Amino acid sequence: MIDTTPTESNLSGLDKKAFQKNINNQQTDLYILKNAQGMEVAVTNYGCALLSIMVPDKNGKYANVVLGHDSIEHVINSPEPFLSTTIGRYGNRIANGKFTLYGEEHQLTINNGPNSLHGGPTGFHTRIWNAVQPNESTVIFNYTSADGEEGFPGNLEVEMTYRLEDETNALVIEYRATTDKAT
C-alpha cells in the first residue's frame, strides 16, 4: 500500500529519491505532472510505469486511484512485472513464441510457458526510457528497440506521452512508433 501523505513536492507522498537509481549507466527517475485543477500524476521512466493518479473527491479530499508502486525497487522486483508499466513490443501472448511475417519465421524470447507474453522478459516494461518534461503537465518518453530485441525484426523508435488536460481533467496517453522494417 502506498502511503498517500502529501509531501511538499507532490500529493501522492512518493519520495523522488526512492525512484532514482543507476542501472547499467542509465538513471531512473520520478516525474510529477500537475494540471490547473489540482490533478496530479506520478510516473517513472523505468517501464513508463504509472505510479499514482491523485484526484479530488466531491469534498476536495485527494485519493490515489491507481494500484502503483512506492519505489523503483518495488517496480523492478514486483511479483506482477507488468503492473502499471508499458508493455511491448506486443500486448498479449504470441503462441509458441513464433510468428511468420512475409514468409519469414521469427522466434521470440519465451516467458510464459511456451509463449511470448507482452514483449518478452525484457520488454518495454523493463527498459529505462529517455524522458523530457517540457512543462508541468506533460512528460515525453522515448525508447529505441533494436532490430532483433526479444526476437522482433526492425529497429523501432517509440514515443510515449503522458499529458494532463486542464479543461477535461483527463490523463491522455499517446503512443507513436516508427520502424525501418516490417515488424
Protein language model features and the residues they cover:
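Surface-exposed acidic/polar loop and edge beta-strand patches at domain peripheries
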Residues: 2-183
